[in-house]
Regions:
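Glycoside hydrolase catalytic-domain context in secreted enzymes
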Residues: 1-338
Length: 338
């Protein structure tokens, strides 16, 4: 197999380095091994490809793309087929813009109303969230573009997200906080899963054997790549050991030096590095093949889809005095600045 032959040729240093990003949005390219880079970007409800100065908050300019309603709206449709259409449309735009991995969808449970990223998540209902996430994934992956199911797991608040500790008994964890991810992994089959910032029961998600090895890979049968949220890697040695494959965004080699020493002194098997490098390469070559094909993209059709999704996601909570639907000949007043 091509990937195995490449891994055999690579130095240990290069294999370790491959598993960290080259910059904010790309993996490392190694011409001497025939390894291209992979470009990824945010995209739960629309592509956000930054070609110049990159930043996590999206403050700098991005290439134009269709802005679909966020998951908080599309969940109101209760329509997996609609989410599959949106996923497919974002996948087509990703191909047209040279993006091999879309960082979405988000499947975290809405627990805290103060969570600033609730708009990225579908629902308080883990079953609904899982079904819609799976549909989005199927739609995008059918275009040959990878997806990243996030943020795994129990990342339901933003306050102190880098240091917080989600303490959960096993039943609560599995019945509520893991259910959406389990459905999405088994039914959607995403190319990647993104691990979250916080600790889960005292262990950082990027270091968690229980989460990444025992549950995700062994119980659920996930065979894809695990990527960190940006800056979420805690212990790179333990990350390799438990199957946390790609550390993003990269840019620093201090963790790589620790891994190199750990392999040399025998505390980390080199096979752990090989396994992660293999999963990174599999995704890189899949994306390269997809992006080598010409991609046509009908943005007007996507705008129409976005409008339909917004309408289908709108939910009427109260119709006081039967005012809706509006009478055809009635007059209305629109007041205020536009």
């Amino acid at each position: 197999m091509k990937i195995d032959k490449i891994i055999q040729k690579m130095t240990l240093e290069d294999k370790i380095a491959l598993c960290s990003g080259e910059n904010f949005w790309e993996t490392k390219k190694y011409e001497k091994y025939g390894i291209p880079s992979l470009f990824m970007c945010d995209g739960p409800h629309g592509l956000r490809k930054q070609e110049d100065a990159a930043d996590m908050l999206g403050l700098n300019n991005s290439r134009p793309a269709t802005c679909f309603p966020a998951e908080v709206t599309t969940a109101g449709s209760w329509d997996p087929e609609l989410l599959a259409e949106i996923g497919a449309a974002i996948g087509r735009e990703a191909k047209e813009q040279g993006v091999g991995l879309v960082l979405g969808p988000g499947a975290n449970l809405k627990r805290n109303p103060l969570c600033g990223r609730n708009f990225e998540y579908f629902s308080e209902d883990p079953y609904l969230a899982g079904k819609l996430a799976a549909a989005f994934i199927r739609g995008a992956e059918a275009q040959g573009v990878g997806t990243s199911l996030k943020h795994f797991a129990a990342n339901s608040q933003e306050y102190r997200r880098f240091t917080s500790n989600s303490v959960l008994d096993d039943r609560t964890l599995r019945e509520l906080y893991l259910t959406a991810f389990e459905i999405a992994v088994k039914e959607g089959k995403p190319s990647t899963v993104m691990c979250a910032y916080p600790k889960l029961n005292g262990v950082h998600c990027s270091d968690s054997k229980a989460l990444l090895t025992d549950i995700l890979r062994t119980e659920w049968g996930f065979g894809g790549m695990v990527i960190t949220d940006w800056g979420a890697m805690n212990d790179r040695i333990e990350g390799f050991r438990v199957g946390c494959d790609l550390s993003m965004p990269g840019g620093s080699d201090y963790m790589e030096k620790d891994v190199l020493q750990a392999v040399k002194d025998g505390t980390l098997p080199e096979s752990c590095v090989d396994d992660s490098a293999r999963r990174v390469l599999k995704l890189v070559f899949q994306a390269t093949e997809t992006l080598s094909q010409k991609a046509a993209c009908d943005y007007e059709a996507h705008h129409t889809l976005a409008k339909r999704a917004a309408a289908e996601g709108a939910v009427l909570l109260k119709n006081e005095d039967g005012i809706l639907p509006l009478k055809q000949n009635a007059k209305i007043a629109v007041i205020g600045a536009m």
